[in-house]
Swiss-Prot record:
Signal peptide interval: none
Listed SUPFAM superfamilies: Fibronectin type III
Subunit structure of this chain's protein: Self-interacts. Interacts with VIN3 and VIL1. Component of the plant homeodomain / polycomb repressive complex 2 (PHD-PRC2) large complex during prolonged cold, composed of core PRC2 components (VRN2, EZA1, FIE and MSI1), and three related PHD finger proteins (VIL1, VIL2 and VIN3) that mediates histone H3 trimethylation on 'Lys-27' (H3K27me3).
Organism the protein comes from: Arabidopsis thaliana
Keyword DNA-binding: yes
Protein name in the entry: VIN3-like protein 2
InterPro entries membership: FN3_dom (IPR003961), FN3_sf (IPR036116), Ig-like_fold (IPR013783), Oberon-like_PHD (IPR032881), VIN3-like (IPR044514), VIN3-like_C (IPR056990)
Keyword Repressor: yes
Amino acid sequence: MDSSLDGAAGDSSKCSEMSVDEKRQLVYELSKQSHLAAEVLQAWSRQEILQILCAEMGKERKYTGLTKVKIIETLLKIVSEKNSGECEGKKRDSDCLPIQRNTKRQRKVDNPSRYVIPATNIVTSNNASGSCSSVNTKGESTTIYCKNLACRAVLRQEDSFCRRCSCCICRKYDDNKDPSLWLTCSSDPPFEGESCGFSCHLECAFNTEKSGLGKDKQSEGCCFYCVSCGKANSLLECWKKQLTIAKETRRVEVLCYRLFLVQKLLKSSTKYRNLCEVVDEAVKTLEADVGPLTGLPMKMGRGIVNRLHSGPDVQKLCSSALESLETIATTPPDVAALPSPRSSKMQQDCSYVLSNEISADTATTGSTKIRFEDVNATSLTVVLASNEIPSPPNIVHYSIWHRKVPEKDYPEKSTCTLFIPNTRFVVSGLAPASEYCFKVVSYSGTREMGVDEINVLTRSAEEGANCSSAVERSVSPLTNCSTLSSNPSSVEAESNNDYIVPKKPSSKNEDNNSPSVDESAAKRMKRTTDSDIVQIEKDVEQIVLLDDEEQEAVLDKTESETPVVVTTKSLVGNRNSSDASLPITPFRSDEIKNRQARIEISMKDNCNNGDHSANGGTESGLEHCVKIIRQLECSGHIDKNFRQKFLTWYSLRATSQEIRVVKIFIDTFIDDPMALAEQLIDTFDDRVSIKRSAVGGSGASAVVPSGFCMKLWH
């Protein structure tokens, strides 16, 4: 044995200064003395022995399942077989290490699959850069490889570290790299674009201000900035990795360290406060058992998560946070465009019913649940956090801004501020056929909880006019008029806007023309039969009485004529009076009294409607009641039969006191539909079930209250 090699064999410090080829030569010499070889190699480090073993086999393996003694025996066996030439290389690779039989994934094409150190080259290493280079016997530098045995990537001359396996901040690599503790600059969405591909330790990123994850750094997004190129990259994947490991781990030290990392990552983001609250709760629960989290992997006596009192609860919170994070990753952008109000066929036809259900104008978005109702050409109603979807308990008030979509900035002053529970506001002064963007900011005290933006398109002026005319047609008066005089030629006229008042013939010409008038009147009489009146009573949405102005016009026009048109309201009279049991033939003085009574009733109705309008926006009292009853039927709290009877009674027979009681019930139980339905059924079931008798003859019918005839007129 050479003297220099003999001295190195006994001194481990000299051995560390030797090159790989010199170490291999020394091992070959030691293999000839089997009693001395094992003792000398035992003084060497495990990494030095593995380096020689990989060079001898031509393969890079970690041999984590073998002890140091077993590795030395394997190395000496391979060297002895090479010296004796007893077996071939292929057989040696397959037989010498039976434990390492697992197939490994192929490396990428742009990197060398295996690196074999040539016997004629001298390898020099550079510990600072983490790379090594091979120099041939002529002194010419050839190829530079990464010092990491698990990487061995080819490096360029200008590279100071391996971008594939080393940190771009500390320029070091991990022997057993954990990808969940590294951040990589990539082109993955939502931050697409050219990336450098460098990676760094997560701990190094926390200690560097350029990464945006410093102690005092806060950002609205969930990103970090590459220290090398400055590109923004998403942190969502890193969050999910930490939470997944924390949810599945069995070791307490791993759970503590991962939760510490998640909490540190979330503190740098102002956008995901809800997720941060869940993680903070998990950390507080865990700290009650293990103490404050220092951030470094720790060894604990009770190292199993299931042995901790709070272990299962903490991992459940991790699962909850992970589900919230998955929802965030799959949520579309915040700004969502509402469907245009013109797209609904119901709104194009403007076929509104008395219930005024505008489901097509309603849309929700975001956590605040913004809804638009009564979208017109110049105004609309904004509704936040409806009764079906109440607002979160920590929300105190909302501030609303609006602008046209082409405009970039919102006005400095907010459009309105809504405080819980009042979450409805009418916005007027809008331009027809214009798209507006509404921004709603929710607050908990002075703290901003969230921002939602939503677009809406107002109607055009033509659509607004068409809708107005359609609404007028839908509520056009359907008269039910009849005369109770002894004149047999008197007829009952019924139409939307016109009426027929036949006169007694005063001349021959009038006698000749009277049959044509009677024929036309007879045709119109066919429209109103007893069955029609019963059908009208069953479906209250298809019957509307004459309003006060039209009744005044009818009475003024018929004052000078013998037959008098009597409206349903004047026919029935005062609902509370027993004198209204029978129809009365009106005289001049009676008409004046009826006119005054109608004015008083109109004023009362306006007052009632005003009360409802205050609670229900632009809805009248009857419309508001019909809408509520219809909602109770759709939700299954009442049946169709009760709905028909109740609305017929409410619109035709209910007294002012009963209407007031119904209004109080609706306003009181509006948040509890089931209780409202039970109260209405219990209070008014008997009243709505009372049938009204129809009297009259020769095709003319009138609906009057049942009972004894107390007075008689002639």
